[in-house]
UniProtKB/Swiss-Prot annotation:
Family stated for the protein in its record: Belongs to the PRM1 family.
Function of the molecule: Involved in cell fusion during mating by stabilizing the plasma membrane fusion event.
Subcellular location: Cell membrane
UniProt cross-references to InterPro entries, sorted A to Z: PRM1 (IPR026777)
Biological processes, Gene Ontology terms: plasma membrane fusion involved in cytogamy
Protein name: Plasma membrane fusion protein prm1
Residue numbers on the Cytoplasmic membrane side: 76-122, 342-406, 631-722
Gene Ontology CC annotations of this record: mating projection tip; plasma membrane
Keyword Lipid biosynthesis attached: no
């Protein structure tokens, strides 16, 4: 292949090193000693610039970026601290207002409590009056039903018995009266006949007796007969029965007595209730009003200052760590770079022999010598292929991807990503301290809730004391009379039973009716009265009221629920609508951290884009190499280059001379001037010597001199520029 086109030259055309040395042997360039004065940098000069290697500079740039980021982060944290202090003051003010809410709410709650108690008492009074009236009427009705039923019952029995007795006596009297009168009349008639005969007999005797101066009395029993005719049973028999009949009690006295006795306690209770609670008004001044609260947790608690002090210490520590680590790394990287420079120097010395042998592609030799690592990597990768064309393409692709410009872009991208990684580590170190701030803020909320709970509990206890006093007053002044009235009713019922029993005893005592009437009374009235007394005893035992107490957390339950039981962070009473964090203080810190995070993210994206540019460049070279990799060279008839006319050696290699051939007359001539090369015919030489890096392949170098053109730095294979 031909490696140049007609009319082009390499500018400037430098003579081989040593061609100006008059002491050099004829036909060869004599190099200077490396430790002497040379136009290029020797080993010591190269080692003196080890600290200027790219890795040290990149690490220092990364260090500078990290320090700038740490400084900016510290400035942002200072701003966040000021905002957090302001937010804490706002929270403190709001917390004080929240803690003082019992002071403002208690007035309304007290009014509500008083109104509720008044309504309850008024309802209780109405209920009691209605209940007392109903119980009074019910008891009186019940007692009247009982004794009137009993009155009707034994009136029926007694009157029926007396009526039957009176009927029997009346029939007996009529019979006796009629019989006695008839007997009297019959006896009267017989006596009259006998008396008439006797009187006639006696009249004769009287005539005789008159002669003797005497008179026989006549018999006259008509008067007695008349008395016999008029005989009848005495009316006292009917009078006794009428007395029994008329003596049946009507219980009017019992009715009046029981009614008066029963009504008295009920009416007294009504009067007392109306007198004591008729116009009941709850004493609102007795209910407590809590004092205002002033919270000072921002001044008393150093949680925020502690958090930001820890953040500042973390940033300073990270700055020191990065400073120490990166400086040490930048210093230590000089060691392998120095070792690399030594190896590079030795490699350059070894590979400089290729130049002296005048047997290889000069551009390839220059590339191998100037870029030993990338060239070595390309040669190593190309060794996997047996085809020389593919070996060349592999080396070209690697050289394309590792050109100075490409490596600059790659190193810039990696340095940017490494700087982003350092900033990310610093950011994560700060984020790990955020839960401490959240915990501190949670304690702020707990302090507010605790203050609310204490104030609410104290107010509730005082209010409950007032309510208990009112309940005791009602139980004593109102329901105490209920207890008294139930006792009085029980006593009245006992008096009713005793009075009724006394009436029955006075009326039927000693008679055969007393025992049955007593049994009937116990059955009809006694058992019912006992049941009523049992019910009144139950009322007496349970006649009291207990107004419900005010809960201790009535004024703090909402705030406590927003802190402990809320599933949404925005439900916290410390949060503003739309806050994504649990409170305003951590929202300030998170906003700063998110800002820093966005900056790191932006830098990462930029570095990734720079890395993508290098990757795209690598893909361009790889795609072109792959296209040529699977292609073939064109023949001359297809537009390819002219055939190479040279004779290979016995090993099949064609020696390719370098650009400049040592001047055999140089020993007797002065050193040449550095000028544009003159147009000279191509010089072809055939040399072959073994060297470490192998052969550059079959080459033919042609240099056409042109005084006004600069030679291209592209490697040319044939007449096609790659």
């Amino acid at each position: 292949m031909v490696f140049s086109r007609s009319g082009r030259s390499i500018f400037p055309l430098l003579p081989p090193y040593g061609a100006h040395d008059p002491n050099g042997g004829p036909g060869r360039a004599v190099p200077l000693h490396p430790d002497g004065i040379t136009p290029y940098l020797g080993l010591r000069a190269r080692l003196s610039q080890v600290w200027l290697n790219r890795w040290t500079i990149l690490l220092l740039l990364v260090l500078a970026r990290v320090l700038i980021a740490a400084t900016g982060m510290q400035s942002d944290m200072d701003s966040a601290k000021r905002e957090a202090q302001s937010a804490c003051t706002s929270v403190e003010t709001m917390g004080s207002a929240m803690a003082s809410m019992p002071h403002y709410l208690s007035r309304g709650v007290n009014e509500l409590t008083a109104s509720g108690v008044e309504a309850a008492v008024n309802g209780l009074i109405s209920m009691l009056l209605l209940t007392i009236t109903g119980v009074e009427a019910l008891i009186i009705f019940f007692i009247k039903v009982m004794y009137q039923t009993y009155l009707c019952l034994f009136t029926m029995v007694v009157r029926g018995s007396t009526q039957a007795a009176l009927g029997v006596i009346q029939d007996t009297t009529e019979f006796l009266n009629k019989t006695v009168q008839t007997v009297g009349e019959d006896i009267g008639k017989a006596v009259e006949t006998f008396e008439s005969g006797l009187n006639k007999f006696l009249s004769g005797i009287n005539k005789v007796a008159s002669a003797f101066g005497g008179e026989v009395p006549t018999l006259n029993i008509s008067k007695n007969i008349d008395e016999l005719k008029d005989i009848h049973l005495p009316g006292s028999i009917n009078d006794t029965i009428d007395k029994i009949n008329s003596s049946i009690p009507t219980f009017d006295e019992v009715d009046k007595f029981v009614t008066d006795v029963l009504k008295f306690p009920f009416e007294e209770v009504k009067s007392l209730i109306n007198g004591s609670l008729g116009n009941y008004t709850f004493d609102r001044s007795a209910l407590p009003v809590p004092a205002k609260e002033q919270l000072t947790f921002c001044d008393e608690n150093n949680g925020i200052n502690t958090f930001f002090r820890k953040v500042a210490e973390t940033i300073v520590a990270a700055r020191k760590i990065f400073l120490a680590v990166l400086i040490i790394a930048a210093t230590l990287v000089c060691v392998p770079v120095a070792w690399q420079e030594i190896r590079r120097w030795r490699t350059m010395k070894e590979r400089s022999q290729i130049v002296r042998k005048d047997a290889h592609d000069p551009m390839d030799v220059v590339y191998i010598v100037s870029r030993p690592h990338t060239a070595g990597a390309g040669i190593k990768a190309a060794s996997r292929f047996s085809n020389s064309r593919r070996q060349i393409l592999v080396r070209w692709a690697i050289a394309y991807a590792t050109s100075p410009a490409a490596l600059f872009v790659l190193c810039l991208a990696l340095a940017g990503l490494f700087a982003c990684l350092c900033q990310y580590l610093l950011l994560k170190a700060i984020e790990r301290t955020v839960p401490e701030l959240t915990s501190e803020v949670g304690e702020f909320a707990e302090k507010v809730v605790t203050s609310l709970q204490n104030t609410s509990a104290k107010w509730a206890n005082d209010t409950n004391g007032v309510i208990d006093g009112m309940s005791n007053d009602i139980n004593k002044n109102v329901l105490g009379w209920v207890n008294t009235s139930t006792t009085a009713v029980n006593d009245t019922l006992n008096a009713f039973v005793d009075k009724t029993t006394g009436v029955l005893n006075d009326t039927f005592g000693g008679t055969i009716l007393y025992s049955p009437l007593q049994d009937v009374f116990n059955c009809l009235i006694g058992l019912k009265v006992a049941s009523v007394q049992k019910g009144l005893t139950w009322v007496h035992d349970h006649a009291h009221v207990d107004f419900p107490h005010v809960p201790n957390d009535i004024l703090s339950k909402g705030a406590d629920s927003s802190i402990n039981n809320s599933t949404s962070a925005s439900d916290s009473f410390l949060a503003n609508p739309g806050d994504k964090t649990s409170d305003k203080i951590t929202e300030v810190v998170m906003r700063v951290l998110n800002k820093i995070k966005e900056g790191v993210r932006t830098e990462t994206i930029i570095s990734a884009c720079v890395l993508g540019i290098w990757f795209i460049n690598f893909l361009f070279g790889l795609i072109r190499a792959m296209i040529l990799f699977w292609g073939r060279d064109k023949n001359r008839g297809e537009g390819g280059g002219a055939p190479i006319n040279n004779n290979p050696d016995v090993n099949g290699f064609t020696e390719v001379p370098l650009t400049a051939i040592p001047n055999t007359q140089a020993a007797s001539l002065p050193a040449p001037r550095y000028e544009v090369a003159l147009k000279t015919p191509p010089v072809v030489g055939h040399f072959h010597e073994d060297e470490k890096m192998g052969y550059a392949g079959q080459r033919a170098l042609k240099v056409d001199g042109t005084s006004d053109l600069r030679g291209s730095s592209y490697i040319e294979y044939g007449i096609e520029k790659r």
